[in-house]
Amino acid sequence: MDAQTKIIRASHMIDMNDIIREGNPTLRAVAEDVTLPLSDEDIILGEKMMQFLRNSQDPVIAEKMGLRGGVGLAAPQLDISKRIIAVLVPNPEDAKGNPPKEAYSLQEIMYNPKVVAHSVQEAALGNGEGCLSVDRDVPGYVVRHARVTIEYFNKEGEKKRIKLRGYDSIVVQHEIDHTNGIMFYDRINKDNPFTIKDGLLIIE
């Protein structure tokens, strides 16, 4: 049984055992485009990926299932070499600890996502990046575009174009990298991991 057939079964919930780790060749392969119109199998896969993110952000479910919290997941991380990503970025509480008016700043399953335009300015997260497929800390600034325009198809097969900046931009670029065989630490300066080039925006 291949990975996708296993994962899309009605009884299956994605957990950490489904996520492959660095060293697996699928993480270094360029994934295939998803065919349109979308198959039921690919739609279900996307929905299962999104459900994993929801579960991973729920403290009770995450503890019960032994999940690491995540804001993004790409199909290649499940050993499925297809250009499918899910992103679920929660909005923070305000300064007084009140919940946000909108729960998520970005909530989408993207098929065949690609960066079609980007800023000259670059950005990096101040605390670096992590990855569900990497079981170690890799310190350093992961240099990416500060702003991007993304084209993708949603699960209804509609073509969408969105502009992203800040943390949302970083998350989507990280996941698209997975569909191109790129790991986040490939973008860290090997000689000086915390070097700051002119104009680099540090996102805290």
From Swiss-Prot:
Q: Which SUPFAM superfamilies match?
A: Peptide deformylase (SSF56420)
GO biological process terms, semicolon-separated: co-translational protein modification; translation
Instruction: Spell out the disulfide connections.
Output: none
What Enzyme Commission number(s) does the record list for this chain?
Answer: 3.5.1.88
Keywords in alphabetical order: Hydrolase, Iron, Metal-binding, Protein biosynthesis
What is catalyzed by this enzyme? N-terminal N-formyl-L-methionyl-[peptide] + H2O = N-terminal L-methionyl-[peptide] + formate
Q: Does the keyword Protein biosynthesis apply?
A: yes
Provide the active-site residues from the annotation: E175
Q: Does the keyword Ubl conjugation apply?
A: no
Looking up Pfam families in the UniProt record yields:
Pep_deformylase (PF01327)
Q: Which residues cross the membrane?
A: none
Q: Which cofactor does it need?
A: Fe(2+)
Quote one Gene Ontology molecular function term: peptide deformylase activity
Per UniProt, the cofactor note for this protein states: Binds 1 Fe(2+) ion.
Residue numbers binding Fe cation: C131, H174, H178
Q: What does this protein do?
A: Removes the formyl group from the N-terminal Met of newly synthesized proteins. Requires at least a dipeptide for an efficient rate of reaction. N-terminal L-methionine is a prerequisite for activity but the enzyme has broad specificity at other positions.
Name the protein family. Answer: Belongs to the polypeptide deformylase family.
HAMAP family, alphabetically? Pep_deformylase
- Protein name, entry field: Peptide deformylase
Native source species = Streptococcus thermophilus (strain ATCC BAA-250 / LMG 18311)
At the highest ranks, the source species' classification is: Bacteria, Bacillati, Bacillota, Bacilli, Lactobacillales
Name of the coding gene: def
